[in-house]
Amino acid sequence: EALLKISQVLQAEPQIDTMLNKVLRLFVEAVRCDSGAVYLYQSKDNSWQKNAAYGRQDQVDAVAAQLGNIENQQPNRHALCQAFAIRGRDGHILGYVILEHKGDHEHTSQNFLIFSERLTGMLAIPIETRQLIESQKALLEAFILVLADAIDTKSAHTGGHCRRVPKLAMMIVDHLSAETQGQYADFHCNADDREAFRLAAWLHDCGKITTPEHIIDKATKLETLYNRIHEIRTRFEVLYRDAEIACLKAQLTGTEQACAEAQRDAQYAQLQDDFAFIAKCNIGGEFLSDETILRLEQIGQRTWLRHFDNRLGLSLLEQSLYHHPAPPLPVQERLLADQPEHIVAWDENYNPHVEREDPLNMHGFDMQLPHYQRNIGEIYNLSIRRGTLTSEDRFAINNHIVQTLIMLTKLPWPKHLQRIPDLATNHHERMDGQGYPRRLQAAQMSVEERVLALADVFEALTAADRPYKSAKTISESLMIMAKMCQENHLDRTLFIYFVQSRLWLDYAQQFIPPHQIDEVDIDAVVRTAKANHA
């Protein structure tokens, strides 16, 4: 009967420590011992770890202290405390079962030793199997953490985003799962659900490893790998010197000095004003009106004289962008220009299949593909009405979630982790169905996916390590999120729960600088979230 019970535990219990504790109790009772323990070898630090214990441990611990010296010794049947080796299939020692008894005839017989060794032998394969499973899980988790760290390290400006979002998301899910009343009383995460969500939270931005960093960090409109405002300023410097030269030439041909210098100074002032205007537009801090864009175009019509070949010293890729013959030098160039070489078209080697009607769209994406892969035209970029991103830039950034889903669906997830691709990639969907990459409706999104969306937004608003924006205080962040609830972007019910539970404060005390932690008018935030969007 004892053997049957032990076999049932070995087959049914997935957790190694729980399994060993149950088996040890049955083991000790079956051989009528007083106490016992199971020690397993830890190769990473060459030590012995007690994984299970039953009864008094004084004598057991004394024997355990000598485990490193008894590997090849046979159990002494006259000892009151005996260690039985658990050997793997290749003969190496996985651990020991240590049993303490009274030393009576029953426990000093050869039959006791043989029976105990056989029972111990039953543990080897289940232990090896569970250790293999746990090592594979540890390896998978390590890969995931390494990938998240690589993304954060790749950009000094995203800092710990891939680490902070999982912390907040798990904080919220655990709190929801503990609810016994209210709207989330029926929400429960078992161990498998929790593991899937935790790993998904770590992987939620894994596609960013494919996103050009200069686009993620694009802090000004003219920024590519560097801020091209410096090129524009150099052209203004050329015109500035041209004005000085024109002044001197005018005087040589008889124009009065005062008149020539007045004309020069007027040009100086206009150039200074025009450059300051362009520089301000480059920041992207305010909405551009039609009048502002018209002035940009007018300034861009001015010309400067280029004397040097602009196709010297180029890479093969740069050369491939020129599809027309080089004009003879010197050549008049516009002060601001959208040149053909500023445009990179989609090609057969790289053309994301994200449009709904695309027959090669295998993942249900529903996104609009911009006409070009890249467009760094100067007027085109400076004319961005709000922010610093063109439609091409925005797609390149949003494409990270497309790549996340493609990457994660290629992995052979075990059954209990098969929700990870959806959990990880739906945090950019919206409650009104206007999100991306698949325009999911609210009814298609689980509570966990809504939690990750909320955590991602709150972390982004409060993060102090982004070059393209200043960090918001907690009160500012929550009010912005309340307005996002009005717009059916975030889940209103979940957001109100988040605010009223003050989970944001628990997170803030761990991850947000003190100067950003201000007073929050919870009632005002909740009222704003509940209000209908105008």
Show which residues each predicted segment covers.
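Signal-transmission linkers at sensory-effector interfaces
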Residues: E1-T18, E29, K50-N51, S135-V146, ...
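Regulatory loop-to-helix N-cap segments in sensory/regulatory domains
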Residues: L94-E117, I127-R130, L389-S391, Y468-A471, ...
